[in-house]
Amino acid sequence: MLFATTLVSAIGPKKGLAKGPMGPAEHLYLYEKTPVEDHAWTIVEHGSWGKMTILFNKMFFVFNGHKLVADTQYTLISYREPGNTWPATNCAILGTGTADANGNVHIMGFLMPLLVYNEYPTDTSNEYSGTGAKVWLVLSNDMDGTTLQDWNPAEYLFEGDLLRLPSLI
């Protein structure tokens, strides 16, 4: 079952709302992972990573990625599970950015594109249970509109956990 919404709660390594000058925020961490067929993917120690800060009261986010390939364009997406077919279509584009000479990328925007929520486990993914959205940083060249057409997982950052619907709903 797939559905979309703009309400989101980030459940990650750091639980609970952080209070900042712009109001309550949550954080979602993305990591470089080692793809392992039929097993949970492991986080690459000292690998590329990113942090997404979501400001609920403004439905605004900021993403900062680190240790990326310099001068490479990246796209932050909300990934739609493809079922048992490939490629994954109708992924939500949250923003794009180019890594600077130090391998850092900065992407920010409003959560106006609908985040894609999947019901887990799915035909293609059993690492989670419940409902949530996967957020990935992928190579912009691997996207064709909202379709993730190419697969280069060693070059991507993957969620540390799902973005989940707020518990108030």
Predicted regions span which residues?
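Secretory targeting signatures
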Residues: M1-K14
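N-terminal leader/targeting pre-sequences
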Residues: P13-I169
